[in-house]
Every structure is written in structure tokens, then in C-alpha cells.
Amino acid sequence: MVLPNFKENLEKYAKLLVANGVNVQPGHTLALSIDVEQRELAHLIVKEAYALGAHEVIVQWADDFVNREKFLHAPMERLDNVPEYKIAEMNYLLENKASRLGVRSSDPGALNGVDAEKLSASAKAMGIAMKPMRIATQSNKVSWTVAAAAGLEWAKKVFPNAASDEEAVDLLWDQIFKTCRIYEEDPVKAWEEHAAILKSKAEMLNKEQFSALHYTAPGTDLTLGLPKNHVWESAGAINAQGEGFLPNMPTEEVFTAPDFRRADGYVTSTKPLSYNGNIIEGIKVTFENGQIVDITAEKGDQVMKDLVFKNAGARALGECALVPDPSPISQSGITFFNTLFDENASNHLAIGAAYATSVVGGVEMSEEELEAAGLNRSDVHVDFMIGSNQMDIDGIREDGTRVPLFRNGDWAI
């Protein structure tokens, strides 16, 4: 199998990511994070960014092999310390209000078998060191977009029955192009129409200002409180300079932050989670008074326990997102082992930090004010998928009356 018009569609994809994703403007700095395997796409992105007037494009290359070798052989004292040059680079990007484009294509199991203690220590150290960048991103001080590219090892996991490596990669690129609307006659217009539909759902939810959400499904009975003056967001966002951008491509979600002090019940994951180079399945979480009191996983149990119990703020939630089961990604029937895609096939929750934009006036609040408003503060943010065609969700008003939001996994409003 050879994907028809691949080069033409890859060029369209690069243009969409640069012009509509991060929305590069004259004078901008762009930081591109991308795997060495995606050299062709990287070059197209760099070319397009400079064509739109970028003053500097910084490419941060990633390599699964190099990363795995580091974790296998580097001593713990090196892994749990972040080098000064990385912090200096972060500060440079922040000072220049650099837009960030992350293109994900890694093998979901690249770090399988690596010492969980090393992974946990490194992730914790990076989370603390990169906190200023995370805060800037989660409060939309800068434009940022997360997208994907078809990596070989990733493609082989998604399409294990493909006739060849080439076919697996082609099949994955085909799904990326479909979900990002590259095959549409006018991808930009298609994105505008899609964003308008999601925005209408967010506006309805913002008008209601529910006090809580109640989720029920096999293995799930969970009530999440919502902060006062919470904000539901959808596809598009606006940075501190007043420039629009698309944080996720693809996207099917409408999301906000729960009140991290108000979560009671239990929830079971419905899709695998790829986190820290490990595939985690069968997650079960129990909450009391907003806190995770028990978490288990059928696969990757220790990785999840380390995430929750070894990172500040990781015992509470920072995001709840609504995604209808009939979404195109869900209906494809494909498990992507990639959060960007799998979270857009399913209702999901995020362990850890909330976005400052999830409450009115949040971007002007201090960390202490955000916490007082009910937004979780943490050095991590990890989504896990809980939706299915058997999930019902009710919005609960202040007076206790209920409004059906989801029935059998789809919008009821």
C-alpha cells in the first residue's frame, strides 16, 4: 500500500499546523518538538513558519532509542536532576513568547521494562523544573499545539495485522489526515465549522453553571463537583497577545476543571493509556472528598501508583472532558495507544494540574488564588479515558435538579 498524494497531503498538514494550529505570525519564535524519524515533516513545518514571517524556529529533536538508552544506563543522580541548559532554554522560550508545536510519534511502549523508579524520578524532576513553562502553557500565555505523525513502531502497535511496515505507517497517516480534516476540500473551513459545533456545546454548559456532574457506567459511579464560575472550553483558544490557536489537532472535546476538593465515587478506564513510555490498562480509581484513596491497574500498576503518590497534587483531578462516543475517532474502532487520539474518542479525566483558563479570571490569578477557587495545582497532568457507549452523565444544579447531558455515550442536549 502506498498512500495516494502523500507528499501533497503532508504539505497541507504542515501548513495547517503552522498557520491554524499555532498560528505563526510575523516576528514569532516557534519551538518545534518532533522525532528524528519525522525529518520530512519537520522541514516542511520549518519552511512554512519562516514563510509566514517567523524570526526563529527552534527544533527540539526527540529519539526513542536515545531516550531508552539514557534510562537504562544513566545513574539516578543524573536522571533526577535537570541540566541547567534545559532550564536556560525554557527561559529563553518564555522570554521570547515562543509558540510551541509538539508533534508526537513515539513508540507507546518505548520504555517498557525500564526501572519505574527511574521513570518516576525523572518525570518528577522535569515537572518541577519546567513548571514556569507549564503554567504559561496552561494559562495560554503563549500559543501551543499538540499534533501527531506516523512513527513506525507506533504504527505497528496500532495496526499489528498490516501486511508490511510500510502499510502500517500508511494506515496511520491515513487516520491522522482524516481526523485532522486534510482530505476536506478546504481543511481550514472544515475546522472552523467543527469548532463552531463544539463551541455551541461549551456555551450551553457555561450558561448552566452546573454544581456537579454525575457519571455512571459499568465500573463507574462518580460525582465531580465543579468550581463556581467555571469555564467550559472547546477547540479554539486565544493567547495573551490576543492571537487565536488550536491546542489539539485533532480535537473532539469540550472540557473544564472539576473542583479538586469535590470528587466521590469510583471510575474505571475504558482505553489503554500510554504514559512515560509504558502502556497502562484496566485503571480503577476510588475518590473520597476529592482525593484518590486507591488506584490500581491491570497492566502498569506501579507506574500509575508512582504517578499518583509521588507527585504533588496528583491525588486529585485537574480536568474533566466530554467527548461523544459517536465521534469519528471513536467510530473508527481503532485504539491508538496515544492520548491525543484516544482522549478524543472518549470522555476523559486528567490527574494533576488544572488549566488556569478553566475559571473566570483564572489567567490573572496567583497559584494560591487558583487553588482557593478549586483548581488543582500540580507538576503533572495525565489524561485517562473513561467513556463508552454505556456511559450516562447528568449535570446537577445547585438546587439538586438533574439535566441529562449524556445518554449511552452521546450528547443528550
What are these regions (language model features)?
Residues 15, 206-208, 276-279, 313, ...:
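Short solvent-exposed loop/turn micro-motifs enriched in small/polar/acidic residues
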Residues 294-363:
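Dual-mode signal for accessory low-complexity, basic/Gly-rich regions
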Residues 256-312:
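Long, well-ordered mid-to-C-terminal structural blocks that present hydrophobic/aromatic surfaces
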Residues 368-413:
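Extended hydrophobic packing segments that form well-structured cores
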Residues 1-264, 395, 401-403, 411-413:
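Active-site bordering "gate/hinge" segments
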Residues 112-115, 155-160, 236-237, 278-281, ...:
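A short secondary-structure junction signal
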Residues 262-264, 280-282, 289-292, 315-319, ...:
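Active-site lining segments that contact anionic ligands and/or coordinate catalytic metals
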Residues 225, 295-296, 406:
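Short linear motifs in exposed loops
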